[in-house]
């Protein structure tokens, strides 16, 4: 009987379940979108129950479509949108408020207060993160301060907190296991990456009771079992990593100095820095990559908030394309951007600027500008934001990148991949399996149960689909980068009164 590993890939806009073979091939994908909730400008929420319902539907549908039963699944791995925060009642399992999504900016003012109190360095040294509304800690505090009765219940030990992985594990195990892994814990502003523990000083500053926190486990170990009622058999939950760390693992960036960029809703570049903590001097994040039996691994990370989401905006906001793949043909209908630059700072700017008051800006528009120029500028903005991060990463790590491995939905766009190689000046490698986030979760789970024997075996399975070589003149590149930087300066601090 053929055996498989199941990956549960819980993303920002959809929940997916993907079944992988021993060769690392995709056997089946099931996917369901869920509701995006925007209560007011800058606020983004999800219904936590809907997240679990779509994910549990996905895993059942995945096995059904593949024509296999639970007895053929040796392990499940979880990967998730990071930082998104759920607080729920320990007794009933009911969320006390909607999940507050990583994109949500409601705690920006509180982050400013913490900076004004001189606490930025404390958080940076302990967590590797910057004080920004992006991370979970200030979101937990907001729920405790603003949901009636939540603070009192939390102080009595009646509420639990978790990122999405923790929420899924809690529900899949029917409330038996309250756990997260080091990669997810390292995104909360509550976890000390140097000690590998929750940090009492940080918990005190943010007013989060320790009793709310999940147990922190390795990214590759059996933490519990999916209850038999879901798939007809108890299946070990053996892998867990935040989406970007999982993608780094799935792209086999297992040696220090290797880097990948994931092109999804946002854009996320991670460089494996091995077992050393590299503090960034260029406004990148230092984060946990993963913790496996071979040790604790760290990464430098640059986060772009809006990448693929800018294409959704062209479709839903401006109506200039009917579906996302159309953007490539539209952008190819003009030879260049016609001097138009789009800075998609719809939710502020992430690394390396960390400007929560920046807003979306389009510059260089003339009477001759068309929707094709705007489409091209939108695609180019994804690659140019990535360039800003790579420059900082190379300075921090003291390593010149040899190539960038790319994954995520937007890597199917050949124009974007070629432009990315051109502006970076290094080759961009697209793997055969671009579902590397789910693959990473599957690898971590499979390793824990012996389905795969070693990381060397995983490295050998990585296969190249296409390598994009840079072929832009230095003069053209310099002009593009110079104008892009001017456009970014105009977007900064726009919403600051």
UniProtKB/Swiss-Prot annotation:
<feature type="binding site">
    <location>
        <position position="134"/>
    </location>
    <ligand>
        <name>glycerol</name>
    </ligand>
</feature>
<feature type="binding site">
    <location>
        <position position="244"/>
    </location>
    <ligand>
        <name>glycerol</name>
    </ligand>
</feature>
<comment type="function">
    <text>Key enzyme in the regulation of glycerol uptake and metabolism. Catalyzes the phosphorylation of glycerol to yield sn-glycerol 3-phosphate.</text>
</comment>
<dbReference type="GO" id="GO:0006072">
    <property type="term" value="P:glycerol-3-phosphate metabolic process"/>
</dbReference>
<feature type="binding site">
    <location>
        <position position="265"/>
    </location>
    <ligand>
        <name>ADP</name>
    </ligand>
</feature>
<keyword id="KW-0067">ATP-binding</keyword>
<protein>
    <recommendedName>
        <fullName>Glycerol kinase</fullName>
        <ecNumber>2.7.1.30</ecNumber>
    </recommendedName>
</protein>
<keyword id="KW-0319">Glycerol metabolism</keyword>
<feature type="binding site">
    <location>
        <position position="243"/>
    </location>
    <ligand>
        <name>sn-glycerol 3-phosphate</name>
    </ligand>
</feature>
<dbReference type="Pfam" id="PF00370">
    <property type="entry name" value="FGGY_N"/>
</dbReference>
<feature type="binding site">
    <location>
        <position position="308"/>
    </location>
    <ligand>
        <name>ADP</name>
    </ligand>
</feature>
<feature type="binding site">
    <location>
        <position position="409"/>
    </location>
    <ligand>
        <name>ATP</name>
    </ligand>
</feature>
<feature type="binding site">
    <location>
        <position position="83"/>
    </location>
    <ligand>
        <name>glycerol</name>
    </ligand>
</feature>
<feature type="binding site">
    <location>
        <position position="13"/>
    </location>
    <ligand>
        <name>ATP</name>
    </ligand>
</feature>
<feature type="binding site">
    <location>
        <position position="243"/>
    </location>
    <ligand>
        <name>glycerol</name>
    </ligand>
</feature>
<comment type="pathway">
    <text>Polyol metabolism; glycerol degradation via glycerol kinase pathway; sn-glycerol 3-phosphate from glycerol: step 1/1.</text>
</comment>
<feature type="binding site">
    <location>
        <position position="312"/>
    </location>
    <ligand>
        <name>ATP</name>
    </ligand>
</feature>
<feature type="binding site">
    <location>
        <position position="134"/>
    </location>
    <ligand>
        <name>sn-glycerol 3-phosphate</name>
    </ligand>
</feature>
<dbReference type="InterPro" id="IPR018483">
    <property type="entry name" value="Carb_kinase_FGGY_CS"/>
</dbReference>
<dbReference type="GO" id="GO:0004370">
    <property type="term" value="F:glycerol kinase activity"/>
</dbReference>
<feature type="binding site">
    <location>
        <position position="308"/>
    </location>
    <ligand>
        <name>ATP</name>
    </ligand>
</feature>
<feature type="binding site">
    <location>
        <position position="12"/>
    </location>
    <ligand>
        <name>ATP</name>
    </ligand>
</feature>
<feature type="binding site">
    <location>
        <position position="82"/>
    </location>
    <ligand>
        <name>sn-glycerol 3-phosphate</name>
    </ligand>
</feature>
<feature type="binding site">
    <location>
        <position position="16"/>
    </location>
    <ligand>
        <name>ADP</name>
    </ligand>
</feature>
<feature type="binding site">
    <location>
        <position position="265"/>
    </location>
    <ligand>
        <name>ATP</name>
    </ligand>
</feature>
<dbReference type="GO" id="GO:0005524">
    <property type="term" value="F:ATP binding"/>
</dbReference>
<dbReference type="InterPro" id="IPR018485">
    <property type="entry name" value="FGGY_C"/>
</dbReference>
<dbReference type="GO" id="GO:0019563">
    <property type="term" value="P:glycerol catabolic process"/>
</dbReference>
<dbReference type="InterPro" id="IPR043129">
    <property type="entry name" value="ATPase_NBD"/>
</dbReference>
<dbReference type="InterPro" id="IPR018484">
    <property type="entry name" value="FGGY_N"/>
</dbReference>
<dbReference type="GO" id="GO:0005829">
    <property type="term" value="C:cytosol"/>
</dbReference>
<feature type="binding site">
    <location>
        <position position="409"/>
    </location>
    <ligand>
        <name>ADP</name>
    </ligand>
</feature>
<feature type="binding site">
    <location>
        <position position="12"/>
    </location>
    <ligand>
        <name>sn-glycerol 3-phosphate</name>
    </ligand>
</feature>
<keyword id="KW-0418">Kinase</keyword>
<dbReference type="Pfam" id="PF02782">
    <property type="entry name" value="FGGY_C"/>
</dbReference>
<keyword id="KW-0808">Transferase</keyword>
<feature type="binding site">
    <location>
        <position position="12"/>
    </location>
    <ligand>
        <name>ADP</name>
    </ligand>
</feature>
<feature type="binding site">
    <location>
        <position position="82"/>
    </location>
    <ligand>
        <name>glycerol</name>
    </ligand>
</feature>
<comment type="similarity">
    <text>Belongs to the FGGY kinase family.</text>
</comment>
<keyword id="KW-0547">Nucleotide-binding</keyword>
<dbReference type="GO" id="GO:0006071">
    <property type="term" value="P:glycerol metabolic process"/>
</dbReference>
<dbReference type="InterPro" id="IPR005999">
    <property type="entry name" value="Glycerol_kin"/>
</dbReference>
């Amino acid at each position: 009987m053929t055996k498989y590993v199941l990956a549960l890939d819980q993303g920002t806009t959809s929940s997916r379940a993907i079944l992988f073979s021993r060769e690392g091939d995709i056997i089946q994908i099931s996917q369901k979108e869920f509701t995006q909730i925007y209560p007011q400008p800058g606020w983004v929420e999800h219904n936590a129950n809907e997240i679990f319902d779509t994910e549990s539907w996905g895993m059942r549908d995945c096995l059904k479509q593949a024509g296999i039963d639970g007895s053929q699944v040796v392990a499940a791995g979880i990967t998730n949108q990071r930082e998104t925060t759920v607080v729920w009642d320990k007794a009933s399992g009911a969320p006390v408020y909607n999940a507050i999504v990583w994109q949500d900016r409601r705690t920006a003012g509180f982050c400013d207060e913490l900076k004004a109190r001189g606490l930025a360095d404390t958080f940076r040294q302990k967590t590797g993160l910057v004080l920004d509304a992006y991370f979970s800690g200030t979101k937990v505090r907001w729920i405790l301060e603003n949901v009636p009765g939540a603070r009192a219940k939390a102080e009595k030990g009646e509420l639990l907190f978790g990122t999405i992985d923790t929420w899924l594990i809690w529900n899949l195990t029917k409330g038996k296991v309250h756990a997260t892994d080091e990669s997810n814990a390292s995104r909360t502003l509550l976890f000390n990456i140097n000690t590998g523990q929750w940090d009492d000083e940080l918990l005190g500053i943010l007013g989060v009771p320790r009793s709310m926190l999940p147990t922190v486990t390795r990214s590759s170990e059996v933490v519990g079992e999916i209850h038999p009622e879901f798939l007809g058999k108890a299946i070990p939950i053996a892998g867990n990593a935040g989406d970007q760390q999982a993608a780094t693992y799935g792209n086999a960036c297992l040696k220090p100095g290797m880097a990948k960029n994931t092109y999804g809703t946002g854009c996320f570049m991670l460089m494996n820095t091995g077992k050393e903590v590299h503090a960034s001097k260029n406004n990148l994040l230092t984060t946990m990559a993963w913790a496996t039996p071979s040790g604790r691994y760290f990464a430098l990370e640059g986060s772009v908030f809006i990448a693929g989401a800018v294409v959704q905006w062209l479709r839903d906001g401006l109506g200039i394309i009917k579906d996302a793949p159309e953007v490539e043909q539209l952008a190819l209908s003009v030879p260049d951007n016609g001097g138009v630059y789009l800075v998609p700072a719809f939710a502020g700017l992430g690394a390396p600027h960390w400007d929560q008051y920046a807003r979306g800006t389009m510059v260089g528009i003339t009477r001759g500008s068309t929707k094709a120029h705007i489409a091209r500028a939108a695609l180019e903005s994804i690659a140019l934001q990535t360039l800003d991060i790579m420059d900082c990463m190379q300075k921090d790590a003291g390593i010149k990148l040899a190539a960038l491995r790319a994954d995520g939905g937007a890597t199917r766009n050949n124009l974007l991949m070629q432009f990315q190689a051109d502006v970076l000046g290094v080759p961009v490698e697209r793997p055969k399996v671009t579902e590397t986030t789910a693959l990473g979760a599957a690898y971590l789970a499979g390793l824990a149960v012996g389905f795969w024997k070693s990381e060397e075996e995983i490295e050998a399975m990585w296969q190249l689909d296409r390598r994009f070589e840079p072929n832009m003149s230095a003069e053209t590149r310099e002009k593009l980068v110079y104008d892009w930087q001017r456009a970014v300066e105009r977007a900064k601090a726009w919403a600051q009164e």
